[in-house]
Structure formats: structure tokens, C-alpha cells
Swiss-Prot record:
Keywords: Cytoplasm, Lyase, Pyruvate, Ubiquinone biosynthesis
Gene assigned in the entry: ubiC
Top-level EC class as recorded in UniProt: lyase
Name listed for the protein in its UniProt record: Probable chorismate pyruvate-lyase
UniProt record similarity statement: Belongs to the UbiC family.
Function as written in the Swiss-Prot or TrEMBL entry: Removes the pyruvyl group from chorismate, with concomitant aromatization of the ring, to provide 4-hydroxybenzoate (4HB) for the ubiquinone pathway.
Length: 186
């Protein structure tokens, strides 16, 4: 489970049009691509993609998550933190959250995913509607210690199905950037 500072509200999540300091075009494409990240990572790794769970459980959500989900501050939710791995390397740190009340009534068993990809589940159910993609430089303090680094790009979006909303944040780790660059220059 990653740490959070109670006084820190969170990063400024921005839509594409709001970006002043945009990343290079290749990274911009990865950040704002509407397709399933799971499928893209699977292709990039030539089928050697895996999910490595780090934490799953109920806890108070961060202020920026509550705001994005329309919950009162310190609302409780299910938190799932995983690494999305390619070729045995941590490529993406993903944090998915959903409000307790919506999850219990929404028919999505996030607690039973194990090493399965949440993205695959969300993209295989046409009832889920993806909201706007937003990006930021993810706070170093919110990353697992082994991958804590300043200035890593992250994206997030909300998936809605009836009263159920799931907020998914994905942090692109340096090993992913290397893999993308290497694949582009083969």
C-alpha cells in the first residue's frame, strides 16, 4: 500500500487541451490512447504480459479520488494496487478505486480479480463507459518505494456502469518508456 500525506490534496490532473508542458509525441500517444492499456502492453511484450498485485483492501480514499468519484472527503473504497508487467519488468503501477457503497451494489467483484487485469474486465463489458483521460506527474510519495521517482507521467479515467464508478490511475514507469523506445527503433 502506498503512503499518503493528509495535508496533500493531490496533483493537478489535466486533460490533453490543458497541458502546457506536454511529453514527447510517443508518450503523449500512450497517455491519451483510448484503447485498453492491457492489450497494448500485451502486444508490446509479445504476449509476455502479467499482473502482479501489491495491495487490495478497504481504506479511506485520497481527496483527489473522492473528488473524481463524487464522494465526500475521506470516503471509503476498495483499493487495488498492481504492477502491470511486460517481459518480467514492472512497466506500469496501477491504482484502481471504487466507493464501498457503489461496489457493493454494482456487481463488480474487484476483490476476486487476483492476477487478472481489471482493464480487460472493464473493456470486455460494453455497459462500462470510459470518461475523460487526465494526466499528471504522479506524486513520488504515492509510488511503491522500489519505483519512487519524481516526474513520472500518469493517466487516469473513470469507468461508469449505472451507479458504479471505478477510477483507474496508471503510472508509466521507466522500464515501459525503454520498452516503447526499443520497439520503435527495431
Amino acid at each position: 500500500m502506498t503512503q499518503q500525506s493528509p495535508a496533500f490534496i493531490g496533483p493537478a490532473w489535466l486533460e490533453r487541451e490543458q497541458l502546457i508542458d506536454a511529453p514527447d509525441p510517443v508518450m503523449l500517444d500512450w497517455l491519451f490512447n483510448q484503447d485498453s492499456l492491457t492489450r497494448r502492453l500485451d502486444r508490446l511484450s509479445d504476449g509476455r504480459f502479467s499482473v502482479f498485485p501489491q495491495f487490495e483492501g478497504w481504506q479511506p480514499l485520497r481527496p483527489d479520488e473522492c473528488l473524481a468519484l463524487g464522494l465526500p472527503e475521506a470516503g471509503e473504497g476498495w483499493v487495488r494496487e498492481v504492477y502491470l508487467r511486460g517481459n518480467g519488468n514492472n512497466w506500469v503501477f496501477a491504482r484502481s478505486v471504487a466507493a464501498r457503497s457503489a461496489l457493493q451494489d454494482g456487481g463488480l467483484d474487484m476483490d476476486e480479480l487476483g492476477t487478472r487485469s481489471l482493464g480487460e474486465l472493464l473493456f470486455s463489458d460494453p455497459a462500462f463507459v470510459r470518461g475523460t483521460l487526465e494526466v499528471c506527474h504522479y506524486p513520488e510519495a504515492w509510488l511503491p518505494a522500489a519505483d519512487a521517482a519524481r516526474g513520472l507521467w500518469a493517466r487516469r479515467s473513470r469507468f461508469d456502469r449505472d451507479a458504479l464508478s471505478v477510477l483507474v490511475a496508471e503510472v508509466f514507469l521507466p522500464a515501459l518508456c525503454t520498452a516503447i523506445h526499443d520497439k520503435d527503433h527495431v
